[in-house]
Amino acid sequence: MLVKLLTKVFGSRNDRTLRRMRKAVELINQMEPDMEKLSDDELKAKTNEFRARLEKGEVLENLLPEAFAVVRESSKRVFGMRHFDVQLLGGMVLNDRCIAEMRTGEGKTLTATLPAYLNALSGRGVHVVTVNDYLAQRDAENNRPLFEFLGLSIGINLPGMPAPAKREAYAADITYGTNNEYGFDYLRDNMAFSPEERVQRKLHYALVDEVDSILIDEARTPLIISGPAEDSSEMYIRVNKLIPQLIRQEKEDSDSFQGEGHFSVDEKARQVHLTERGLILIEEMLMEAGIMDEGESLYSPTNIMLMHHVTAALRAHVLFTRDVDYIVKDGEVIIVDEHTGRTMQGRRWSDGLHQAVEAKEGVEIQNENQTLASITFQNYFRLYEKLAGMTGTADTEAFEFSSIYKLDTIVVPTNRPMIRKDMPDLVYMTELEKIGAIIEDIRERTVNGQPVLVGTISIEKSEVVSRELTKAGIEHKVLNAKFHAMEADIVAQAGQSSAVTIATNMAGRGTDIVLGGSWQAEIEQLEDPTEEQIAEIKAAWKIRHDAVLAAGGLHIIGTERHESRRIDNQLRGRSGRQGDAGSSRFYLSMEDALMRIFASDRVSSMMRKLGMKEGEAIEHPWVTKAIANAQRKVESRNFDIRKQLLEYDDVANDQRRAIYSQRNELLDVSDVSETITSIREDVFKTTIDGYIQPESLEEEWDIEGLTERLKNDFDLDMPIAEWLDKEPQLHEETLRERILEKAKEEYQRKEEVVGVEMMRNFEKGVMLQTLDSLWKEHLAAMDYLRQGIHLRGYAQKDPKQEYKRESFNMFATMLESLKHEVISVLSKVQVRMPEEVEALELQRREEAERLAKQQQLSHYEENALVTEDPNAPATAERKVGRNDPCPCGSGKKYKQCHGRLQS
């Protein structure tokens, strides 16, 4: 009560922020007449003037009013479009490291030009982040004339571009690209073998479009660069045949319930659990199939990988549905993004899940992958010095933006008042009744000339509605993952009179639905349109636009509630843009996933008490409240999952930053000999300590073991026993010094043979490759630790603290292994001529390039990260055998060619 009273008196934080910014808007408006008087050349010269002022020490905030005024005036001259005052407010919010909530149709793309220009003046680069390649290209090309008029360069960063083109794109003042591509480039840069291979500059300012989609919906999805692991496709096929024989039961076994089935499903957590009967049956079937030995248990340590196959196959059959979670196209399983309904070509689920789905669908099974590098969007975007974002729906997630990204959310007012009519939900008993009511609503509205957009949550649901509309003889267009290429065109024309468009979730997001259809699209179809033709098209569009407005504007139909209120608001937000008329309604049934899992009991009993008849709907504030509560529950659970993922990834993130920092230092120096000398001393001290304890008696020394270890690990023949016999005065300290001295002499001998420069290059290459190899193994071990760490909770230990402790120990062990491995490789390599070192260096580079070509970019499926079944780490790539053909192509056996360069 007191908080409400204080807010009434002083205004909310949002109001106070906007009030402060409106003073700057007034200042920009006062500058407008002066800007109009400037010639084009004088206006263009402002960019260099601003840059000079920044170099002299002026801060960006002081330049903001004048810089925004320059962009506004330039936009008027280049595009014929003047930034509204609310767009200036949006630009200031984005410059202020905040999230700007701007409704659909309020001109977010034009708003973004203001902070992009201002922050590009420093010359440190601005990254504009979009959700797909189409929007990145569209926005870059649309804004290119404005930025080039102002003397700024524009780059577009797309998947598949060669490194030189990417480097050029990143060197531009403003770069447009997708969140995935920026993240993958960061990972690839940290796998480069020379400074020239890197493409990104230091991460300065990121301006994220559809920020809720990228920083929240995809936050649970780490970006992973992976290479091929061991082939186990046959096992997936064999296990897949057994799963259909298992029977589902309604809930897990407990003291009060014993079912008859073999597994239960937790739909909230998206997990499958084998019952005791299920475990016995699957073990019997595995033994009958000859996959598992008689008397063995599926839970024995030797069968961890087999358990992994069974779990993956069970999840593939029970939790993942064709045309909902994935589609099968040209013999390939392609993931469908649960948030956008778009296909994710080239992305694969991890932990063997993708292979299990391929086995289920009977398509060719591709190899499992091993993680080489990974990062979450949460941690990637927190690397930027300055981060901001914009979207039409952020306020419901303001707490998450603040707690995870330290970004405040500011709701920017609309240019014109919102007059869309949002009608209460209608709830039916069955899916069939609901679909029937939707078809009837569409029929009534299209007869009056009103366009309708139908939002569904999956491809399967969109095709169900499409079939019913076809039966009813209603013309319509379907926009889902299967028709991705036509997306923008279909959306652009969805505002035509009586048009019916079915869209999965937010497919087509980023393209405005204009009432009466898009007149720009009509003009683009003409080769060289004349002024008269353009005027005719605009006049015809005006008539259509007014007719659609009179019919009530765009009507939105939601076929069910999404688990997030924000996604529902996004669907509604497609209507009522820029003060246009519009309406929306959601149709629900008790068979919808959200209602069945979260709101079924209360609403079902209410409907029964009311004596609902077939075809009747309930429309009541209580129902709306129950649904809103269900959505809040899901949002809260999803937030907890994202927060938990971040807490675990923060541990890996600290290690990642340390490794990447070390790696970049290595790349940037040409001589690592001092580091090698320091490491050699550490490694030999540790090795000798294992056999000769400091300050111990000679009788306690294991001379034979030390001699053998020096030979095996470093290829050093040292007659230590002979030295001790011949030189009684040789004590522990002098013995240590002699061993190290002899090791240095042997190394210097090799260096004299091949030359200093060649040896320096070889040292650097060995350090980089060893670091990458051990980091890859460390990531696999971390994944393995992460998947089983929750079991520590049963021992009254905090899993997060245990994970931190163990991962730190693993990291320390990895660093020690790195030192030992580097010195071992450098000591054991046998060289006779400089050409041999050059050949070895070439072989190392070819292997690195081959691996780079085989890299696959993957997304973890969210629940694969929190699966309860620990999986064995993936095996490293197969090494070249001594009797295999040499990879250099000479035709000789490896041991007789490049293999002889290594002991």
Swiss-Prot record:
Listed GO MF terms: ATP binding; metal ion binding; protein-exporting ATPase activity
Annotated SMART domains: SecA_DEAD (SM00957), SecA_PP_bind (SM00958)
GO cellular component: cell envelope Sec protein transport complex; cytosol; plasma membrane
EC numbers on record: 7.4.2.8
Tagged with keyword Cytoplasm: yes
Residue span of region Disordered: 853-903
PANTHER family linked: CHLOROPLAST PROTEIN-TRANSPORTING ATPASE, SECA INNER MEMBRANE COMPONENT OF SEC PROTEIN SECRETION SYSTEM
Name of the protein in its database record: Protein translocase subunit SecA
Species annotation: Serratia proteamaculans (strain 568)
Lineage: Bacteria, Pseudomonadati, Pseudomonadota, Gammaproteobacteria, Enterobacterales
